[in-house]
């Protein structure tokens, strides 16, 4: 299971079922769980914890120092869950300040040459395509899809089931359930394909699908300000039997409200309106 040319520090903790390919280097403080397969020419170092049944492809570099001049050599972490695919030459840097972590959840796919900067958090079932660069402190919610060859600014949040088109520049938050594309990035439409694949177009959940479409038109195609749109949606969600009363819309509204706080980047605007440039909702 361990190729004789692999260099594994005696202090590393590898489950007996872990496979390690030729010329891979694994550092002293690394922990790797059962069933994980590490291919050839991989470097895993630092305080890195990797769960079960992951596949790490040739050339990946995980747990090395952050690309941050503030880093002083402190104990910082990379935590990776289970069932992730980490393809060729992916880089995942550990966090910057003592005790902090860069986190990758479960069932994620990081395609070749993707970069996950320090302190990033990727939840579950996220797909990051080839050549994507995530700056520090980017947070990506579950089931988001990030197309290839694009950059995401530090501290940006990308919402659940969002879709980001290739070669975009993402410098502000991407709201959940939206399709975003462009340089600079703009909200173009609902992520209709993603919502359908998630089952929201089925008859039992069609009211959720319909409510999100109505909310999109209100937020991005009306003449209302963001504050007015959010006030309207918040009031509607409180009404008994309202079609706007569901967990998906609640999450969208909460995301936008939080995004507009002074410590956040603010949400991306729509393609033809500037209303989402407002802050401090």
Residue positions per predicted region:
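Terminal amphipathic alpha-helical/low-complexity segments used for targeting or macromolecular assembly
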Residues: 1-5, 10-11, 16-17, 53, ...
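Structural signal for interior beta-strand "rungs" in well-ordered beta-sheet cores
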Residues: 1-186
């Amino acid at each position: 299971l361990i190729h004789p040319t692999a260099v594994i520090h005696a202090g590393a903790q590898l489950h007996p079922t872990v496979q390690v390919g030729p010329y891979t280097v694994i550092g002293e403080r690394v922990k790797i769980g059962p069933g994980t397969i590490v291919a050839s020419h991989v470097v895993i170092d630092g305080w890195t914890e990797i769960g079960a049944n992951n596949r790490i492809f040739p050339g990946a570099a995980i747990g090395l120092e952050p690309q941050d001049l503030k880093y002083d050599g402190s104990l910082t972490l990379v935590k990776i869950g289970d069932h992730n695919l980490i393809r060729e030459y992916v880089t995942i840097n550990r966090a910057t300040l003592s005790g902090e972590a860069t986190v990758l959840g479960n069932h994620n796919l990081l395609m070749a040459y993707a970069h996950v900067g320090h302190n990033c958090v990727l939840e579950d079932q996220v797909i990051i395509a080839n050549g994507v660069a995530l700056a520090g402190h980017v947070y990506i919610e579950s089931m988001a899809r990030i197309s290839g060859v694009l950059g995401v600014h530090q501290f940006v949040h990308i919402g659940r089931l969002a879709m980001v088109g290739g070669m975009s520049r993402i410098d502000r938050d991407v709201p959940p359930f939206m399709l975003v594309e462009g340089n600079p990035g703009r909200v173009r439409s609902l992520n209709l394909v993603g919502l359908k694949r998630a089952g929201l177009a089925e008859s039992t959940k069609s009211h959720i699908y319909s409510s999100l479409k109505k909310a999109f038109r209100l937020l991005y195609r009306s003449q209302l300000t963001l504050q007015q749109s959010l006030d309207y949606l918040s009031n509607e969600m409180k009404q008994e039997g309202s079609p706007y009363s569901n967990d998906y819309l609640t999450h969208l509204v909460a995301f936008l409200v939080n995004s507009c706080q002074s410590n956040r980047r603010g949400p991306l605007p729509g393609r033809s309106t500037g209303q989402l440039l407002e802050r401090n909702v």
